[in-house]
């Protein structure tokens, strides 16, 4: 089992000593007049610590929270309490002591933050792939303390279910609504979890259904906020937290998640190849020109399936755009796809627009011109 270790430095000693009585072998800490637990007082690397048996640790944590006893940030004495608490948290998470996890995140972390003058406190622990534990911590902890944990889960944990995402989004909505209605214009922008993070589990499996549900659920993020109680400035500020999928989001998501890292061997965790989701996003746009920069990246990386979807989207509506794609194609396969999609390669050949094209594209056009001449 993991003992709970607590600093018994000068400030804490002043507060705690009146509750402690020495016995023949150890010490008793009185939680009330007739209720006590046994503790040890040990010296480690020149510092005194209270050592609490795990079975009594929840009572002890509740006691120091109630008495608001913790190391003050003004008294620097290098007791490294957060490292000690991290070891303890590892244990309770690993063994799923939900009752202690709840108190740890709901009461103990707020105590640490208030005494250490911290805006947020994010503990690292093992067993970060257990979705039920992560969901429970997210539910119990504050948004600022658990946001990074959820983002890390979205990015790293495989096979995240629709049920899990639905629960997490519901918790996020509730927490955000509560924070905004309490703080208004003072709501930290750092509390926002961007849409692309929520979409990582859908990207991992190219799951259009999961993608659609996440987008739909997050589009109502601010619906639970009573906007009749907000003034003009608050309403304007609330727009910053809007999570509706728009053209700007699509461009950003396409570039950062579905295109940029796709051939990056150093970053396998972010290599999402999602032709189904790509199609869904492309066909939600009104104008292909909104994607011009991403189209060049698709051509540069020679992403044939993405290019095929673009051609389906454009159809016969913008032959000039298909022509531009052909001129900047990087492979024979890409060039052939664009020819099959209606590019007039003979007209391009005669206009001399292919001077900037790749040698393989010029070679393909020359071969086709010769074949046509001989037929």
From Swiss-Prot:
Superkingdom assignment:
Viruses
Q: Which family does it belong to?
A: Belongs to the mimivirus L17x/L18x family.
Q: What is this protein called?
A: Uncharacterized protein L180
Q: Which organism is it from?
A: Acanthamoeba polyphaga mimivirus
């Amino acid at each position: 089992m993991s003992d709970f270790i607590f600093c018994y430095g000068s400030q804490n000693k002043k507060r705690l000593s009146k509750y402690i009585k020495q016995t023949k072998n150890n010490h008793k800490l009185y939680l009330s007049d007739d209720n006590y637990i046994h503790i040890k007082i040990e010296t480690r690397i020149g510092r005194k610590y209270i050592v609490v048996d795990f079975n009594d640790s929840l009572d002890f944590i509740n006691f120091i929270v109630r008495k608001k006893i913790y190391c003050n940030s003004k008294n620097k004495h290098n007791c490294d309490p957060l490292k000690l608490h991290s070891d303890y948290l590892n244990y309770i998470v690993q063994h799923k002591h939900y009752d202690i996890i709840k108190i740890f995140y709901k009461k103990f972390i707020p105590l640490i933050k208030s005494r250490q003058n911290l805006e947020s406190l994010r503990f690292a622990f093992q067993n970060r792939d257990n979705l039920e534990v992560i969901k429970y911590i997210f539910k119990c902890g504050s948004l600022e303390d658990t946001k990074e944990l959820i983002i890390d889960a979205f990015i790293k944990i495989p096979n995240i279910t629709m049920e899990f995402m639905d629960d997490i989004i519901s918790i996020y909505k509730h927490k955000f609504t509560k924070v905004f209605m309490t703080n208004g214009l003072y709501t930290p922008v750092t509390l926002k979890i961007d849409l692309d993070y929520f979409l990582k589990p859908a990207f991992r499996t190219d799951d259009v259904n999961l993608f659609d549900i996440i987008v739909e659920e997050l589009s109502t993020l601010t619906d639970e906020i009573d906007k009749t109680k907000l003034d003009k400035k608050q309403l304007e500020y609330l727009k910053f937290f809007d999570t509706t999928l728009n053209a700007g989001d699509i461009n950003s998501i396409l570039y950062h998640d579905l295109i940029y890292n796709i051939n990056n061997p150093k970053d396998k965790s972010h290599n999402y190849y999602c032709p189904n989701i790509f199609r869904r996003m492309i066909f939600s746009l009104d104008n292909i020109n909104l994607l011009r920069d991403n189209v060049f990246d698709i051509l540069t990386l020679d992403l044939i399936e993405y290019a095929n979807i673009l051609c389906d989207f454009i159809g016969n509506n913008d032959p000039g755009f298909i022509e531009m794609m052909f001129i900047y194609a990087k492979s024979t396969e890409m060039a052939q796809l664009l020819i099959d999609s209606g590019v007039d390669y003979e007209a391009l050949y005669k206009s001399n627009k292919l001077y900037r094209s790749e040698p393989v594209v010029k070679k393909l056009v020359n071969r086709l011109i010769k074949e046509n001449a001989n037929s």
